[in-house]
Amino acid sequence: MKETNYNYDKKRFETFIDAVIAIILTILVLELKIPESELTSDLNTRQQLTHLIPSFVSYIGSFLLITGIWIDHHLLFLNLNKLTRKYILLNMLFVLSLSVVPFTTAFAGHHYLDSFAVALLFVNYVIMNILFGALYW
C-alpha cells in the first residue's frame, strides 16, 4: 500500500500513547490484590503481606520499566519530524506488547517459583524493547 501525503497529527497520537500508558500503569497496580482472609492479628497481617512481596517486586520492576519507556517515547516524539502510517502501525505493535505487561507481571508475581512464568515476563520485556528500539530506525 502506497503512503499518501496525509499529515497525521503528531500531538494527538502522542496523547493517545500517553493515555494508553497511564491506563496500563493503572491496570498494573490493580493486579496487587488485598488478601481476602480476615486479618486477625498484626502477625497475620505481616504474614499475608510477606506473601505479596513477589507481586510487589514484579510490579515495581514493570512500573519502572514502563516509566523509562514513557520518558524515552516522549523524547523520541520531540525529535520526530513527520508521523507516517508505517510509524503509527509500528507504534501500535509496540503498544500491543506493552499492554500485555500487566498480565505477565501478575503471572510472574503469583508464580515466582515457576521459571516459565518469570521467563514469560522477560520475553514480554524483550519483545517490547525490540519493538520500541525499532521506532528509532
Role assignments for model-derived ranges:
Residues 2-137:
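Multi-pass alpha-helical transmembrane bundle typical of ion/small-solute transporters
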